[in-house]
Amino acid sequence: MRFLAATFLLLALSTAAQAEPVQFKDCGSVDGVIKEVNVSPCPTQPCQLSKGQSYSVNVTFTSNIQSKSSKAVVHGILMGVPVPFPIPEPDGCKSGINCPIQKDKTYSYLNKLPVKSEYPSIKLVVEWQLQDDKNQSLFCWEIPVQIVSHL
């Protein structure tokens, strides 16, 4: 029994250690306050994103409003121009958030950032926004990244 408990604890600690808080720029969170942004794996910044890989994104935020729904909008910003960055699940209510969103409640938003093999090897800024049912930002953050062929 002790072995099982120790194994479970070790597994939980190793999973927690893989989530790296990143330094981010708030790009206009209107209806919420970002507590923390984690991108995994991203041990150093700018995050090195390998083509063909997928990265976990976890945003802890507190909502300042009530909202029936939420929608993620992600862009890669190249030389000041936002380019849509498709993600597998844009519905925030299917990404770790139990909707309706309540005022003054803290949430953990979870999603994936897939990096397609056909993306060029470049430096850019990822802008990730979660919009409420009035298209206002529950959160908006930016981080610099570099897309690379292989790490």
Swiss-Prot record:
Family the entry assigns: Belongs to the NPC2 family.
Tissue: Detected in gallbladder bile. Detected in fibroblasts, kidney, liver, spleen, small intestine, placenta and testis (at protein level). Epididymis.
Subunit structure: Interacts with NPC1 (via the second lumenal domain) in a cholestrol-dependent manner. Interacts with NUS1/NgBR, the interaction stabilizes NCP2 and regulates cholesterol trafficking. Interacts with DHDDS. Interacts with NEDD4L (via C2 domain). Interacts with NPC1L1.
Localization in the cell: Secreted; Endoplasmic reticulum; Lysosome
Disulfide-bond pairs as recorded: C27-C140, C42-C47, C93-C99
Role, per record: Intracellular cholesterol transporter which acts in concert with NPC1 and plays an important role in the egress of cholesterol from the lysosomal compartment. Unesterified cholesterol that has been released from LDLs in the lumen of the late endosomes/lysosomes is transferred by NPC2 to the cholesterol-binding pocket in the N-terminal domain of NPC1. May bind and mobilize cholesterol that is associated with membranes. NPC2 binds cholesterol with a 1:1 stoichiometry. Can bind a variety of sterols, including lathosterol, desmosterol and the plant sterols stigmasterol and beta-sitosterol.
Coiled coil segments of this chain: none
One Gene Ontology cellular component: endoplasmic reticulum
Protein name: NPC intracellular cholesterol transporter 2
A GO term, aspect molecular function: cholesterol binding
Carbohydrate-modified residues: N58, N135
Endpoints of the signal sequence: 1-19
Domain notes: Binds cholesterol in a hydrophobic pocket; there are no hydrogen bonds between the sterol and the protein.
Catalysis: reaction(s): cholesterol(in) = cholesterol(out)
Documented effect of changing C47F: In NPC2; leads to the synthesis of misfolded recombinant proteins that colocalized with an endoplasmic reticulum marker; normally secreted but unable to correct cholesterol storage in NPC2-deficient cells
Domain of life: Eukaryota
Induction record: Down-regulated in response to enterovirus 71 (EV71) infection.
Modified residues annotated as N6-acetyllysine in this record: K116
Disease the record associates with this protein: Niemann-Pick disease C2: A lysosomal storage disorder that affects the viscera and the central nervous system. It is due to defective intracellular processing and transport of low-density lipoprotein derived cholesterol. It causes accumulation of cholesterol in lysosomes, with delayed induction of cholesterol homeostatic reactions. Niemann-Pick disease type C2 has a highly variable clinical phenotype. Clinical features include variable hepatosplenomegaly and severe progressive neurological dysfunction such as ataxia, dystonia and dementia.
Keywords recorded for this protein, A-Z: Acetylation, Cholesterol metabolism, Disease variant, Disulfide bond, Endoplasmic reticulum, Glycoprotein, Lipid metabolism, Lipid transport, Lysosome, Niemann-Pick disease, Secreted, Signal, Steroid metabolism, Sterol metabolism, Transport
Gene Ontology biological process: cholesterol efflux; cholesterol homeostasis; cholesterol metabolic process; cholesterol storage; cholesterol transport; gene expression; glycolipid transport; intracellular cholesterol transport
Outcome after substituting C93F: In NPC2; leads to the synthesis of misfolded recombinant proteins that colocalized with an endoplasmic reticulum marker; normally secreted but unable to correct cholesterol storage in NPC2-deficient cells
